[in-house]
Each structure stands twice: as structure tokens, then as C-alpha cells.
Amino acid sequence: MSLINMAKREINCKVVYYGIGLSGKTTNLHYIHRTVNPADVGDMVSIDTETERTLYFDLLPLELGRVHGFQIRFQLYTVPGQVLYQQTRISVLKGADCVVFVADSQASKLQENIESFTELGEELRKMGKNPGDFPLVLQWNKRDLPDILPVPVLEQYLNPYRAPSFEAVAVGGRGVVESLRVAINTTLRRLERV
């Protein structure tokens, strides 16, 4: 849920990068942070505990203009993907305006991807959200590796809602900006309807 700062005439939107451990969520955020105009981006913050890490930063894309007279700011978050950090994922997911689900395209990771995507849907439902109507972008990452699944197979198992999806090689930036752009545009369309 977007946070509105009336004093600053600013709307803060939260985009969460979700997926299994080592799927490329952190790589996405690092690439975005490195390549965006430095005037448009805040410092990358890492919330580290003894065994996990969550990253986030603010993105103020000035070219977007205003919605209902408010400047729009996006906060991009990653969640720890390892199974034992479910509570942290739930905490970070709360208040999200959009989710970018980063799937590892390797065949050996399909079951983990399915479990993570199922968990995402369950948590959205617990928060009173309809996963089929919630702003979602899917990213088929690691397309440069051997033993990857064809996109139609990933779509079959991980995209029941026919959300926008992109092939990606996050380490090289392929598909990263495109996924973010659609996440931002989807979020903005929702805001404009309010």
C-alpha cells in the first residue's frame, strides 16, 4: 500500500523483488542502482542480521512527473529467498504495491520456484489481496545458463495470472530495466485509478 506524505506532496510506492535464494533478486537491485541516474536514486541500504540480508533503496524517477499533484518515489526491496526466512519475507512483503518475482530458469530449480511462487500467493491472500489482481511482473532469470527450461514451461508453472514476463540475465542487465519499467507503470496505473 502506497504511503502518502502530505507535507512533502509525495507518494512512496514499494516494489518487492521476490523469489528463491540466489535467483538474482539482489543482482537486479545492484544493477538498477548502478545504472540509474545518481540524482534519481538514494543510497543502497542493507539490513543484515546474523544469517540474512535485505536490501532496499529509494528511486525517484523524475521523468515520471506527478500523479494527482504528488511526486512519486519508489522503494525497491529484496527479500531473503532461503526457506527458513519466511517471516522476513512476509514482513518485507507487507505494504507492497507491486512484486517482481525473479525465477531461476534452471530446470533443477523449478520445484523451488513453484514453492516460492505458491508461498507468495498464500501470503498475498493472508494480507487480503487477490493474487490474480495484484500487480505482478515475472522475470525468467539466468537465461544464459545451460539446462534452462523453455519459457512456455516457466509460463505454464509460474504464471497462472498471465502477468507480464521477461527473459533476463540480471548479471549483465538484460531484462532488468524492462521488468522494473513494467512494475513502475503497473503501479502508476493503479495509483491513477485511486
Indicate where each model-derived feature is located.
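Conserved nucleotide-binding/hydrolysis micro-motifs of P-loop NTPases
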Residues: L22, Q82, Q106-S108, K142-P146, ...
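Switch I (G2) and immediately adjacent beta-strands of P-loop GTPase domains
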Residues: M44-L84
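Conserved C-terminal guanine-recognition region of P-loop GTPase G domains, centered on the G4
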Residues: S105-Y161
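Structural beta-sheet core signal
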Residues: Y17, F101, L138-W140
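Inter-motif core of Ras-like GTPase G domains
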Residues: Y85-S108
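Conserved G1/Walker A P-loop phosphate-binding module
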Residues: S2-T49
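Conserved catalytic network of the ASCE P-loop NTPase/AAA+ motor domain
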Residues: K8, E52-L55, G65-F70, I90-G95, ...
